[in-house]
Swiss-Prot record:
The keyword Disulfide bond does not apply. PANTHER family: FORMAMIDOPYRIMIDINE-DNA GLYCOSYLASE. Belongs to the FPG family. NCBIfam families: fpg, PRK01103.1. Its cofactor is Zn(2+). One of its GO terms (biological process) is base-excision repair. The active site is at P2 (schiff-base intermediate with dna), E3 (proton donor), K58 (proton donor), R283 (proton donor). Binds 1 zinc ion per subunit. It catalyses: Hydrolysis of DNA containing ring-opened 7-methylguanine residues, releasing 2,6-diamino-4-hydroxy-5-(N-methyl)formamidopyrimidine; 2'-deoxyribonucleotide-(2'-deoxyribose 5'-phosphate)-2'-deoxyribonucleotide-DNA = a 3'-end 2'-deoxyribonucleotide-(2,3-dehydro-2,3-deoxyribose 5'-phosphate)-DNA + a 5'-end 5'-phospho-2'-deoxyribonucleoside-DNA + H(+). It comes from Rhodopseudomonas palustris (strain BisB18). InterPro entries: DNA_glyclase/AP_lyase_DNA-bd (IPR015886), Formamido-pyr_DNA_Glyclase (IPR020629), FPG_cat (IPR012319), MutM-like_N-ter (IPR035937), Ribosomal_uS13-like_H2TH (IPR010979), Znf_DNA_glyclase/AP_lyase (IPR000214), Znf_FPG/IleRS (IPR010663). This is Formamidopyrimidine-DNA glycosylase.
């Protein structure tokens, strides 16, 4: 499933095509994705200008001139592509061969600037839902989410406070969207490696007995930010279905330090350890037992 860097990459790709433009056409080619699409979705979208395109955790949010917000999630295999030019009725189109299977093009936005934005989702785990202003705070998918790891409010003190007293592993705590929003298996493994912390370590060890952040918490926050920034710069990680809106692959997977590198040498300077894999809470965890403590 796409994690924060992949969703942020998609947001940045959609922004030039959608932000500031009016939705002149909306086509839902089936009645459902993961969930049934709202019957009035087209009525509430057509004619509205996209005032801004934001992201919360792994969700995209299009702010409309009506005050409504369109909530979008990529699911397991969802991707957007932006068509300009010939494919949208004007010169200069581009697309990627991967997107030629139009059978999975389930939703199409036609924008006033000539862009055509297509949502393709073979597995149909993605979803779209329009929310009125008063519904946003109580939306189940958004309610209770923790801080954004790239936001100003996320720091060692906040992370230590969220982990204080927890008897779960550090990895399990970081995957809890109530602790920090948007992280998934890949970037938790990579961040823990960057901070030289074991995924098996108790989450509570990020805080002192008085609840103050330890040096481990400081290192971990720094590592989380660093790996997310690097992944976004690389266009995310393309392991299965992720594509940028241009159709290009992300390439951060070529920079993985531990994820999917079982049996390979540790990349930490001065460490002669080997990357190991074990199953933790039903997911594969990759780490170097020698330098992650």
């Amino acid at each position: 499933m796409p994690e924060l860097p992949e969703v942020e990459t998609v947001r940045r790709g959609l922004e030039p095509a959608m932000a500031g433009a009016r939705i002149d056409g909306f086509e839902a080619r089936r009645a459902d994705l993961r969930f049934a699409l709202q019957p009035d979705l087209a009525t509430r979208l057509i004619g509205q200008t996209v005032k801004g395109l934001g992201r919360r955790a792994k969700y995209l949010l299009a702010e409309l001139s009506s005050g409504d917000v369109l909530l979008m999630h990529l699911g397991m295999s969802g991707s957007f592509r932006v068509l300009q030019g010939e494919a949208s009725g004007a010169p200069g189109a581009f697309h990627h061969p991967r997107n030629d299977d139009r059978a999975h093009d389930h939703v199409v936005f036609r924008m006033s600037n000539g862009a055509v934005v297509v949502f393709n989702d073979p597995r149909r785990f993605g979803y779209m839902k329009i929310l009125a202003p008063g519904e946003i705070a109580d939306e189940p998918f958004l309610k209770g989410l923790g801080p954004e790891p790239l936001g100003n409010s996320f720091d060692a003190a906040m992370l230590a406070s969220a982990c204080a007293g927890r008897k779960t592993s550090l990895k399990a705590a970081l995957l809890d969207q109530r602790v920090v929003a948007g992280l998934g298996n890949i970037y938790v493994c990579e961040a823990l490696f960057g901070a030289h912390l074991s995924p098996k370590r108790l989450a509570a060890t990020l805080a002192t007995r008085t609840g103050a952040p330890t040096e481990r918490a400081e290192r971990l926050v720094e590592a989380i930010r660093a790996v997310l920034h690097a992944a976004i710069k690389a266009g995310g990680s393309s392991l299965r279905d992720h594509r940028q809106t241009s159709g290009e692959l992300g390439y951060f997977q070529h920079s993985f330090a531990v994820y999917d590198r079982e049996g390979e040498p540790c990349r930490s300077k001065g460490c002669d350890g080997v990357v190991k894999r074990f199953v933790q809470n039903g997911r594969s965890t990759f780490w170097c037992p020698k330098c992650q403590k």
